Amino acid sequence: EFCKKQKLKEAILQSVDLLQKSSFEEISCVINEAIKLGSDNNFGYDYKIDFERRFEKKQRNAVTTGWTEIDALARGGLGRGELGVVIAPTGAGKSMVLVHLGTQAVKAGKTVVHYTLELQDTIIASRYDSCLTGVSLNDLHDFKDHIAEKVADVEGELIVKEYPTKSASVSTLRNHLERLRRSDKNADMIIVDYGDLLRPKKTYKERRTELETIYEELRGLAQEFDCPIWTASQTNRGGLNAEVITMESISEAFNKCFVADFIFTVSRTIAHKNTNSGRVFVAKNRVGPDGLIYPIFMDTSRVKIEVLPATGETVEEIVTKSAKEQEESLKEKYKKYRS
């Protein structure tokens, strides 16, 4: 108790300097750390006393992705305390993928908390309506009664919380989750759309350091609330029309992905968008194989996304094939032009 009191005194004195710098996020962290001191009675895993625990079967309580192929790789989906990242270029459907993942969890009876930092909460909710019912986004108002019936039958719960871009930090999300917990709403899955748009608790000279810190905090949040967190990240321009987006295409901070448990990329060229297709590349998987490529069906008008069985093609084969197809297409156009 004495140590806790002294720590709180130090935190208050430190907060005075931080207040002059308007470092409100750091003040919150310093005070919270001081309050938590002494409240944790877990001294760690005792190697001898806790011997039997090493042989107990661990329960991940994974939440399904709704995709048989991905669930098979991830041993049922994303587990408790794990961080999953969806990587895609702008306009490829990152938010749509996150809505799909949230919908599958809600259908499975889970409570999903979906944070949106870019789109309005009603837009996100409408996408859930479409994904859940199969009704086109443009036709939702015409099928209001049908949608209401479908929503009423869903076992799970969904809470969509909107924050202006770069206004919320991981601490902001933590405070909101704590308020929900006090209202007897415990998150079974958290979705952050998307991590790159969160505000870092501290400003760094380099953006990649800020992003790395944000993703580390998100991983910590998943562990703290003992549930999976899905978020997304944007690729650089090199991934905009790439056949397959690999780890090298991740924008700004390659290191931010090291903390994630499961990473997959979504690539959709112009040709893919015209045919409602694309590719998923499993870039990292802590509980199974990775480096695998899957074709996908993606109809953004109905938020319908399906991962199809793998074809066995490698990244190199796909890129080579694409280059040859483009060359043949250009030759054909040149012939028509000459004639």
Segments the model singles out, each with a brief description of its role:
Residues Q104-N186, P200, I293-P295:
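Cytosolic-facing regulatory segments adjacent to core modules
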Residues E1-I49, A92:
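Short, small/acidic-rich helices and loops at N termini and domain boundaries
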Residues D188-C227:
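Helical hairpin unit composed of two closely spaced alpha helices linked by a short loop
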Residues G91, S171-A187, Q223-F225, R237-S339:
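C-terminal regions of RecA-like/P-loop NTPase motor modules
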Residues E118-L119, T231-N236:
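A short beta-strand-to-loop transition that corresponds to the Sensor-1 phosphate-sensing loop
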Residues V85, V160, D188-I191, F264:
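Structural motif
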Residues K36-V135, L158-I159, K336-R338:
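The Walker A/P-loop phosphate-binding site
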Residues N138-L140, E162-S167, K201-E212, N241-E248:
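Flexible beta-alpha connector loops of hexameric P-loop NTPases
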